[in-house]
UniProtKB/Swiss-Prot annotation:
GO molecular function: DNA-binding transcription factor activity, RNA polymerase II-specific; RNA polymerase II cis-regulatory region sequence-specific DNA binding
Chain's gene name: hoxb2a
Matches recorded under Gene3D superfamilies: Homeodomain-like (1.10.10.60)
Protein name in UniProt: Homeobox protein Hox-B2a
PANTHER family listed in its UniProt record: HOMEOBOX PROTEIN HOX-B2 (PTHR45664:SF7), PROTEIN ZERKNUELLT 1-RELATED (PTHR45664)
Pfam families for the chain: Homeodomain
Localization annotation: Nucleus
């Protein structure tokens, strides 16, 4: 009768909650600073008085006094009998010697909402007996999961550490990237198992490597557009040299030395092979000239001369068009009174270094074939540079 009377007066819920028990201990209130616990202080004191079987120690002492006085007013007497329980059970949570409590359903729901319920589950699994259950579980079972959870939140909120790849792993990944910029999933799994990496690490490494390759390619392309390299210039001269390596025809009028223009068609090729050759004006009334850079004092020297202000260059007449950087504007012959031409001896020295097939082609007005031109350009590249006089 006493149990039913106190249930109707003190407890609205059908099952008592452990949160009501927490309000009666000052030590627990100091350690637990959540708002939900503070709001629950208006709820009556713990349920050991209503269910004495859960706490046999307090039931033997507080129960006889409550049975005598609950007939007059049960609610007031329960508030009076609460202070003795504070002094009796206050040292028990601090000692930590009490075993842990049984796990209730509301505890399971609270832990399932958290990310890592394993520490709380292991603490609850170590419960031995239900004696002094509420007070023991208050300190050991509820405070430690909260502290552990706070530590886990700090760890998960921190930045993930970078993967430290070994030299062997980097070498294998670079080799694979050289052949395949994109990996299919079976190959990615195979590489991850081979290099002792996770599939995610291999995928992220290839993503970063593709971005690095893209940046390098874009930067290299921008540099190519701004300033062409020497290899590109060499290719440009090779492409323009067939036009200048064609055999020359002698024009009837305005030709100072017809035989020289026939026997020295290679001077135009030397002009093209030198990338920084300067344009020179034409001589005479020819409409289709061919440039040739030759200094005054170095008539006997091999090719690759560089024209200077003291050494003006000469222009031979011919049918083939000159390179793009040569001038085609005609000028009067009187503007260049002291021009020296290639002598036949220097042309013969140049032609001696060439193959016999090229020597025969020099004498004929027929254009060079592709094979002769390839051999001609290779011979120009292998001329001894020790005899050059700049």
């Amino acid at each position: 009768m006493n149990f039913e009377f106190e249930r109707e007066i003190g407890f609205i819920n059908s099952q008592p909650s452990l949160a009501e028990c927490l309000t009666s201990f000052p030590a627990v209130l100091e350690s637990f600073q959540t708002s939900s616990i503070k709001d629950s202080t208006a709820i009556p004191p713990p349920f050991e008085h209503t269910i004495p079987s859960l706490s046999p120690c307090t039931g033997n002492q507080a129960r006889p006094r409550s049975q005598k006085r609950t007939a007059s007013n049960g609610l007031q007497l329960r508030t009076q009998t609460a202070p003795p329980t504070q002094h009796q059970q206050g040292p028990a949570p601090l000692s930590g010697g009490a075993p842990l409590a049984h796990e209730f359903p509301w505890m399971k729901e609270k832990k399932s909402s958290k990310k890592c319920p394993k520490p709380g589950a292991t603490a609850a699994a170590a419960a031995a007996s239900p004696s002094q259950a509420s007070s023991g579980y208050t300190t050991a079972g509820l405070e430690s999961p909260t502290e552990i959870q706070g530590g886990l939140d700090n760890v998960s909120g921190s930045r993930r550490l970078r993967t430290a790849y070994t030299n062997t792993q980097l070498l294998e990944l670079e080799k694979e990237f050289h052949f395949n910029k994109y990996l299919c999933r079976p190959r990615r799994v195979e590489i991850a198992a081979l290099l002792d990496l996770t599939e995610r690490q291999v995928k992220v490494w290839f993503q970063n490597r593709r971005m690095k390759h893209k940046r390098q390619t874009t930067h290299h392309r921008d540099g190519q557009e701004g300033e062409p390299s020497g290899f590109d210039l060499l290719e440009g001269t090779d492409a323009s040299s067939p036009y200048s390596s064609q055999s020359l025809e002698v024009s009837g009028s305005g030709s100072a030395a017809p035989s020289e223009s026939e026997t020295c068609p290679t001077t135009a090729a030397y002009t093209n092979s030198s990338d920084k050759s300067q344009p020179t004006p034409e001589e005479g009334q020819a409409s289709q000239p061919e440039p040739a850079s030759v200094p005054d004092t170095a008539v006997h020297s091999p090719p690759y001369p560089t024209p200077t202000a003291d050494n003006p260059t000469t222009m031979a007449e011919g049918r083939a068009a000159g390179p793009e950087h040569s001038f085609t504007e005609p000028q009067d012959a009187t503007s260049l009174p002291d021009l020296n031409f290639f002598s036949t001896d220097s042309c013969l020295q140049i032609s001696d270094a060439l193959s016999p097939s090229l020597q025969s082609s020099l004498d004929s007005p027929v254009d060079f074939s592709e094979e002769d031109f390839d051999l001609f350009t290779s011979t120009l590249c292998t001329i001894d540079l020790q005899h050059l006089q700049f």
